[in-house]
Regions:
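A long amphipathic alpha-helix within ATP-dependent nucleotide-binding catalytic cores
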Residues: 147-180
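Catalytic activation segment of kinase domains across protein kinase-like and atypical kinase folds
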Residues: 184-203
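Short histidine-centered catalytic/ligand-binding loop motif
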Residues: 10-22, 128-159
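Active-site loop/lid in soluble adenylation, ligation, and acyl-transfer enzymes
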Residues: 1-130
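Short, active-site-adjacent segments that bind or coordinate small-molecule cofactors and metal centers
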Residues: 76-78, 177-182, 187-189
Length: 203
């Protein structure tokens, strides 16, 4: 994880000092904490320069450069799904905009009378693909089934509900926080769904 960052696609000159360190810590924390709820591809957080040796054959060794220690994670290799999944639990941003105009949230009808930033009953999972020009397209249920297959899609839907609810409970108890919107990337291995990339890191 590097210190590079951007806002709405515009790079921040010089990045954010130590951002990569905190991104690695956040990801490793939530990957380890939620692995019982939903399996993910996380294997280890490399905090010391010799931590990679545990993955090498006997007699082999590798010394990680000091500037990379605390910024690297080891992941299980899985096949990524060509879609970004987003969980929306509260009426903010584009979710509120669509609801205030149509009564829907990403095409899903909602009860009337909800207020801005209010909890969405049940929360919503949506998926997007991004083309070469950076344009995003929301996938329909039929397109999702074509991408993942029906069994894997059901596993993903079940996983996001368990994961989102577990994280919400943990944050309410420990920090009085809520998660209004969460991006998830899924992959698969032997027809089983795994959380990939990051969990609860600020993008």
């Amino acid at each position: 994880y590097t210190d590079r960052a951007s806002v709405f696609g515009v790079p921040i000159e010089g990045g954010i000092p130590e951002r990569g360190i905190y991104m690695a810590r956040l990801t490793s924390h939530w990957m380890a904490k939620t692995n019982i709820v939903v399996p993910n591809h996380f294997k280890a957080f490399i905090q010391e320069t010799n931590d990679l040796n545990q993955f090498l054959k006997e007699g082999e060794s590798f010394q990680l450069p000091e500037n990379l220690a605390g910024r690297c994670l080891v992941y299980k290799k899985i096949e990524p799904l060509e879609a970004d999944f987003e969980v929306w639990g509260y009426l903010t941003g584009p979710a509120w905009k669509e609801y205030s105009e149509t009564g829907n949230v990403f095409g899903h009808p909602q009860i009337s009378g909800l207020l801005q930033s209010q909890c969405i009953p049940g929360s919503i999972l949506v998926a997007f693909t991004t083309d070469a020009e950076g344009n995003r397209k929301q996938l329909s249920d039929d397109e999702l089934v074509e991408l993942t297959g029906p069994k894997l899609l059901e596993d993903i839907k079940s996983a996001y509900v368990r994961l989102y609810n577990d994280i919400q409970r943990a944050l309410r108890v420990n920090g009085k926080f809520i998660v209004a919107h969460m991006k998830l990337i899924f992959g698969k291995d032997r027809k089983k769904a795994y959380i990939a990339d990051d969990i609860l890191t600020p993008d």
